[in-house]
Amino acid sequence: PDFTEDMLYGKYLPNESGALYYREGFITQLMPTKDKNYLVIDNFNRIDPDIFQTYINVLEGYEVTLPRYNKDGSMIKWSKNKDSFYHFNPNWHIIGVTYDSIEDIKQKYSQQFLKYTRIVRVNHSE
């Protein structure tokens, strides 16, 4: 796959001494900022829509627990709640660049997800 959940939401990796640290994913790194931000994904049509389920759950108002811990040992939460470690930023959007038709993309991805995603269709060069 072109994108994995680890790439979008982050994962634990060993450092040089063998201790684990959490490397942010594209979404978790950009989402908490207060400014308008974009994540541009080329060949968007090649991404399995299931890997966006965590993001969609937050968009739909659910609180999601990520496999990451705060300094106090509690699991990190992501929600629309302003006190959440990762707070949903309504000024943040995914831009998907695709060769597929917009109709194909609408069939593949949920309406809630597409509300926060901008799709740009490019033509194949002959």
Which residues does each predicted region cover?
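AAA+ P-loop NTPase catalytic core and its hallmark functional loops
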Residues: 1-126
